[in-house]
Amino acid sequence: PNSRVLVHKAPVYPTTLTTLNGLNVTLIEADFNDLEDIRKVMQEQDVDGAIVQYTRQKPDDSYEMQAVIDTIKACKDIPIITDDNYAAMKVSKIGVELGADLSAFSAFKLLGPEGVGILLGKAELIDEVERNNYSGGSKVQGWQAMELLRMLVYAPVALAIQAEENERIVHALNDGRIPEIKDAFLANAQSKVLLVEFREDIAEAVLEE
């Protein structure tokens, strides 16, 4: 509470912003696409911690998680929390594996129950969350815990099959399976999205069908 937290100069994810507002946190902005701007802000401002969102907050974002985390830590050894939501199990390393102190994401992103958060990181931070977790409404219930454990086994397989099928569809479309499609490719808009370009201006007609 009442801390000064470094964030990317972009719209903060709504649920994250609600939590920060509830803690009366002061947001200090830096452009994570520009490492020099991070250094400048860290030198000029008294920062208590940082939140780095793994997936892009703006279409032109290009920052690398490792570089941002390393730059912040080099300026001042403050706690860094990464919001790994849509990147969990879809990237080679999540935030805590790149040097952050805590990774946070929703169990729903692993095909688990909604409203359950997952934290990975330093024991003292997780212990503090546990101490402050209100047992009357915030504790994970037994059925939720069991559902999440099942999804930890199922999700890696399901997401891997999904990624494989995405690639297969792209190759099939680019090989001319559907003559009306000129080009197809995958975009990472938090979740993977298949985009196609038609040879003619027929997109509206396709949507109407």
Language-model features: locations:
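Conserved C-terminal alpha-helix-loop-beta "cap" of PLP-dependent enzymes
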Residues: 188-209
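Conserved PLP-enzyme active-site core in the AAT-like
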Residues: 1-159, 163-183
